[in-house]
A protein has these predicted regions:
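Nucleotidyltransferase catalytic core that binds NTPs
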Residues: 2-180
């Protein structure tokens, strides 16, 4: 799907909704936290035998494939954390990301299944994995074939998850990409 077609569907009313959500801090106050805050909160959850699930990505142009991925991820544990890549690190083409980080945070935070949303301080999720120490790190099936990983980071992510005694899970949700 081309960016022009997507822009038709993302009209001014949609953008206005996102901006209003940000201004009103709709759902963000309770869900959007710093990485360090969520890492501390996770310690308490782990002490209470709660399973921590972590997803990481851009989540620009949130679509049904993202939703199914998040639904499938949540089934693996009690607490679902979604970390987002900062705008400066996104290389998905001209005029991308379409939605700025704050808008992407609002979209993800609005999903009931998501417990916390954090921004990754770096280009990769390695620091997030190291600090959160999730029981499960969930990636989409498009990362299952490691040799096809466009980011070339999945190998490092798997090593980091192993180092914190977690498990990598690949969802079976159908692939839908907003950057293809």
């Amino acid at each position: 799907m081309s960016l022009e077609i997507v822009q038709i569907f993302i009209n001014d009313a949609t953008k206005a909704w996102f901006k209003t959500a940000i201004r009103n801090k709709m759902k963000i106050n309770n869900k959007f936290r710093s990485l360090d805050d969520v890492a501390k909160i996770c310690l308490n959850f782990k002490e209470n035998n709660k399973k921590i699930v972590l997803c990481h990505g851009v989540f620009d142009l949130l679509h049904v494939g993202h939703i199914k991925h998040i639904e499938e991820a949540k089934k693996n544990g009690d607490v679902l954390i979604v970390s987002l890549t900062k705008d400066i690190f996104i290389k998905k083409g001209l005029n991308r990301p379409y939605f700025k980080l704050e808008e992407r945070i609002s979209s993800i935070a609005a999903l009931e299944l998501v417990d916390f949303v954090i921004e990754s301080p770096n280009k990769t999720s390695l620091e997030v994995i190291r600090k959160i120490k999730p029981h499960y790190y969930v990636k989409g099936q498009d990362y299952k074939k490691i040799s096809l990983d466009k980011t070339m980071e999945i190998k490092n992510e798997i090593k980091m998850v192993d180092s914190v005694k977690g498990k990598v899970i690949f969802t079976n949700s159908p692939m839908n990409s907003s950057s293809k």
